Amino acid sequence: MDMPPTPLPPETANTSPAPNGATAGIRVENCYVFKSRLQEYAQKTGLQTPEYHTFKEGPSHEPVFKSTVVINNTSYDSLPGFFNRKAAEQSAAEVALMEIVKSIPANANIPAVQETGLCKNLLQEYAQKMNYAIPSYICTKSASGLAPFICTVEIGGIQYIGAAARTKKDAEIKAARTALLAIQGQSEGSANGATKYIVVPGKRVGKEVEKRPIETPKPLKVKKGGFKKKWNKRKFMKKDGQAVDVEKDEARVAGDAHDSDVLMQPTVITQEASCGTLFLQPCEEAKRVEAEPPRDIEMVQPDKENQHSDAALVQPDDEARVEQEPSRDISVVQPNEEAISGKQEPSIDAAILQPKEEASSVKQEPFIDTAMLQACKEAGSVELGPARDTVISQLNEQDRAVKQEPAGDIVVPQPDVHARVVKE
């Protein structure tokens, strides 16, 4: 007995297009039913079991197989060029079946193929491999005649009409035979060179060169390394005891030793001829007090009009108090954070200056006593000699500079907050 068929490798795949306008992508693959069908035919007809002779050809690393089947003393050769033994035997069995179907029963010992029912089986196997529906047979019977039955088979959406027969079974076999011959005839003239056979040798799949995907150049990314470079530069310069980054130092003050980003205004000290000592605080403007002989004291106010009076009291936060003691020439002004004191002669009017952004000047006569400033304390007292007036200047944000004539004393202004003045 013949061994059960096994699937064929991909080399035996049929490359012929599907018949009857089927999709070109559908192929009849692994058609290994022909040996079993030929074995069945031999058993029903009483013939000997088919004998297969397979030959190996070609080099050992790429062998090619060819097979020959012998049935009823007739040999049928397979198509050449198969890459395995089983595929060659299947091809030989197919060739034998096709030749038997085409033959006419000339000898009584060999009955007709259509009588064995092989055509219906082949057509059904073909439909299964092509993923078609099972072939359907429709038979009609005429009123009279020697062959009243005519059968039509439908496969793949196409109907095939068989020849007339005496019985319904014979009519179905003839219809299946007609369908097989039509399918084989349509596959003969295929453009890809395929033959009328289903099992055909395939092309050996060579080792294709591995195609590496084309690498598309990626756009270069902008490196954000500016800060890193500056940081490294600063670190290196700090280690060597040098200055920090030059670019950042442009926005800084050269004397800023703490690497602060806050801009500091340089301290400016000005001094004029014939003037006393001048002291200025940073971040504020200088205020000057000049003394002239017999002039009254002037008051400069950027936002208000000038005011002249014998005695004027300014109270920015609290009330001003004036006290006088008879036998003292020293005047002391003690604001919360700033105090300004000055000595004046009698018969000089007192004026109070309160500019916020501009410099104020106080003119005094010579022979002015010493003024003392004491910051960061509570309100002070002004002590003057008899018949002398007091001069008080209060600034919130600007420095005050005291300028005097040759006989003048030293005035040290320390501006910050409001001052309280006491006059008697």
Swiss-Prot record:
Compositionally biased intervals (Pro residues): 1-10
The alphabetized UniProt keywords are:
Repeat, RNA-binding
Listed Gene3D superfamilies: 3.30.160.20
Signal peptide residues on this chain, from the entry's feature table:
none
- Specify the superkingdom: Eukaryota
- The record's region (Disordered) falls at 1-22, 287-330
Q: Where is the DRBM domain?
A: 33-102, 118-185
**One GO term of the biological process aspect:** regulation of gene expression
Q: Which PROSITE patterns match?
A: DS_RBD
What SUPFAM superfamilies does UniProt report for this protein, alphabetically? dsRNA-binding domain-like (SSF54768)
Tell me the GO molecular function terms.
double-stranded RNA binding; ribonuclease III activity
A GO cellular component annotation here is: nucleus
Q: Where is the composition biased (Basic and acidic residues)?
A: 287-308, 318-328
Q: Which InterPro entries match?
A: dsRBD_dom (IPR014720)
Q: Which function does this protein serve?
A: Binds double-stranded RNA.
Please give the PANTHER family that the UniProt record associates with this protein.
DOUBLE-STRANDED RNA-BINDING PROTEIN 1 (PTHR11207:SF1), RIBONUCLEASE III (PTHR11207)
What is the protein name given in its UniProt record?
A: Double-stranded RNA-binding protein 8
